[in-house]
């Protein structure tokens, strides 16, 4: 389906309306996650420098509309497919569903490339510097001064 998204995007750029309908069924468009946009407002220069990976994950969620589990567990290396973002955290979070998010703007591409460079030589798994899911959740909760509610549209279905 990743390759299909690529070719469907090509067809849409050539004016194929049927391809656009099929593309909308198998991939979603990026829309900001409200919890992450709120969380970005609480990030200070000190918190970004002390937790650069967490700050990058929050920014990624703000741009692509990731839920908290998706943002905290996403393997950045394998998620970037060039034309889309593959969000598949089922190995670590059983309740999640695999999804493809289209990369449509230059800003989305730049953000993903910059964050990809940050994570370039980093193990994104539980043995890496970020720790396991619980450690990442704790760090997120302690980094933000007040509880940032996750709205129903941001949750993993």
Question: What are these regions, as identified by a protein language model?
Answer:
Residues 26-43, 95-107:
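DNA breakage-rejoining catalytic core of tyrosine-based enzymes
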Residues 73-111:
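Conserved tyrosine-mediated DNA breakage-rejoining catalytic core shared by Y-recombinases
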Residues 104-157:
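Active-site/catalytic core of tyrosine-dependent DNA strand-transfer enzymes
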């Amino acid at each position: 389906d990743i390759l299909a998204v690529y070719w469907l995007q090509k067809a849409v750029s050539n004016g194929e309306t049927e391809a656009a309908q099929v593309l909308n069924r198998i991939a979603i468009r990026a829309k900001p996650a409200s919890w992450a946009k709120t969380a970005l407002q609480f990030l200070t220069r000190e918190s970004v420098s002390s937790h650069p990976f967490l700050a990058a994950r929050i920014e990624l969620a703000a741009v692509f509309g990731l839920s908290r589990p998706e943002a905290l567990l996403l393997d950045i290396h394998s998620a970037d497919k060039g034309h889309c973002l593959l969000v598949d955290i089922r190995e670590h979070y059983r309740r999640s569903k695999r999804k493809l998010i289209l990369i449509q703007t230059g800003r989305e591409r730049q953000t993903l490339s910059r964050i990809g460079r940050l994570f370039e030589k980093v193990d994104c798994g539980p043995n890496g510097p970020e720790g396991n899911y619980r450690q990442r959740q704790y760090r997120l909760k302690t980094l933000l001064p007040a509880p940032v509610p996750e709205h129903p549209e941001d949750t993993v279905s």
